UniProtKB/Swiss-Prot annotation:
Mg(2+) binds at D171, N200. It catalyses: N(6)-[(R)-lipoyl]-L-lysyl-[protein] + 3-methyl-2-oxobutanoate + H(+) = N(6)-[(R)-S(8)-2-methylpropanoyldihydrolipoyl]-L-lysyl-[protein] + CO2. InterPro entries: Alpha-ketoacid_DH_E1_comp, DH_E1, PdhA/BkdA, THDP-binding. This is 3-methyl-2-oxobutanoate dehydrogenase subunit alpha. Component of the branched-chain alpha-ketoacid dehydrogenase (BCKADH) complex, that catalyzes the overall conversion of branched-chain alpha-ketoacids to acyl-CoA and CO(2). Induction: Up-regulated upon nutrient starvation. Is also highly up-regulated in a DlaT-deficient strain. Part of the bkdABC operon. One of its GO terms (biological process) is pyruvate decarboxylation to acetyl-CoA. It comes from Mycobacterium tuberculosis (strain ATCC 25618 / H37Rv). PANTHER family: 2-OXOISOVALERATE DEHYDROGENASE SUBUNIT ALPHA, MITOCHONDRIAL. Substrate binds at Y100. Keywords: Magnesium, Metal-binding, Oxidoreductase, Thiamine pyrophosphate. The lineage of its organism: Bacteria, Bacillati, Actinomycetota, Actinomycetes, Mycobacteriales. Pfam families: E1_dh (PF00676). Its EC number is 1.2.4.4. Its cofactor is Mg(2+); thiamine diphosphate.
Length: 367
């Protein structure tokens, strides 16, 4: 076998169509024991807080876009458990490579909501400040971040770092050539990388049934020679446990894993989208009954971990961060157009200097 392509022993070459589920739709624990984890009560409550805060901020982002403060936004309503659960189990030194709908991931990683806001507003480096938290800038081109994730994982291998990279992507991205290359390369070179697909059923107006002829997205892992697993993306504890196992596997040198988190986008693809043109209200209502936040609240109640005081504290926290977001967006300084040219290379090139002067002249002419 070629150098750098060690195969882990005992690799599972089958995928269970039934998603891993620890908390049922009614909020009661399931019989699943393999992935069960005894998390501290503080962590269990914190997961709930992060899901609620994510939803509140998501609502505020939509409001800001409707008020003309943001040109566009990609709502994540309904996907809070898939994002919060997956990000919560990772180490702060694990690198994250998100697409454009990962608000819950950013918040769990400790990125201030205002930083996310100005990134969407386009007034501060396009999100490059995320790198202070080991989180790459959000990727708007579909699937390109998966290549970067694999490259970062290979760098960690070469530097003998004890870190894992996670590529966050959607079901639509799995049809992109970049994602194929990333999956293949990651498996061949046994990189410490996890591919986390949030299957929210729709790639804009394209249903997942037209994305693949495979039984599921997770089944694609078999062809690449890596484990694939499906998880209930509306079950925050299941998402936490499945990601934790995949990250531990990668950290141990056993290579990548493809996770399919089965969830649903309750809102539009973006604030410029009208989902009523391609999906029924009946479908949305059906998935709304599986809303991850009420489900997890019921679970906490049954475990004696929820109280009205906790709810009031979480609500107050959510309102506070909403206010912080609005202040950050409204107070954001105007964008310095020079940064378009000065943040590309360590030293600006002659070609970029010429382009900068052309833009300056055009702006002066139109003032």
């Amino acid at each position: 076998m070629g150098e750098g392509s060690r195969r882990p022993s005992g690799m599972l070459m089958s995928v269970d169509l039934e998603p891993v589920q620890l908390v049922g739709p009614d909020g009661t624990p399931t019989a699943e024991r393999r992935y069960h984890r005894d998390l501290p009560e503080e962590t269990l409550r914190w997961l709930y807080e992060m899901m609620v805060v994510t939803r509140e901020l998501d609502t505020e982002f939509v409001n800001l876009q409707r008020q003309g403060e943001l040109a566009l936004y990609t709502p994540c309503r309904g996907q809070e458990a898939a994002q919060v659960g997956a990000a919560a189990c990772l180490r702060k030194t694990d690198w994250l490579f998100p697409q454009y709908r990962e608000l819950g991931v950013y918040l769990v990683r400790g990125i201030p909501p205002g930083h996310v806001g100005v990134a969407w507003r386009g007034t501060w480096h396009g999100g490059l400040q995320f790198t202070t938290k080991c989180c790459a800038p959000m990727s708007v081109p579909i699937g390109t971040q998966t290549l970067h994730a694999v490259g970062a994982a290979m760098a960690a291998q070469r530097l003998d770092e004890d870190s894992v990279t996670v590529a966050f992507l959607g079901d639509g991205a799995t049809s992109e050539g970049d994602v194929h290359e990333a999956l293949n390369f990651a498996a061949v070179f046994t990189t410490p990388c996890v591919f986390y697909v949030q299957n929210n059923q729709w790639a804009i107006s394209m249903p997942v049934s037209r994305q693949t002829a495979a039984p599921s997205i997770a089944h694609k892992a078999i062809g690449y020679g890596m484990p694939g697993i499906r998880v209930d993306g509306n079950d925050v504890l299941a998402c936490y446990a499945v990601m934790a196992e995949a990250a531990a596997r990668a950290r141990a040198g056993d290579g990548p894993t493809l996770i399919e988190a089965v969830t649903y986008r309750l809102g539009p693809h973006t604030t410029a989208d009208d989902p009523t043109r391609y999906r029924s209200q009946e479908e949305v209502d059906r998935w709304a009954t599986l809303d991850p936040i009420p489900r997890y609240r019921t679970y906490l109640q049954d475990q004696g971990l929820w109280s009205q005081r906790l709810e009031e504290q979480v609500t107050a926290r959510a309102k506070h961060v909403r206010s912080e977001l609005r202040d950050a967006v409204f107070d954001a300084p105007d964008f310095d157009v020079d940064e378009v040219f000065t943040t590309v290379y360590a030293e600006i090139t002659p070609g970029l200097q010429a382009q900068r002067e052309q833009l300056r002249a055009e702006l002066a002419r139109t003032d």
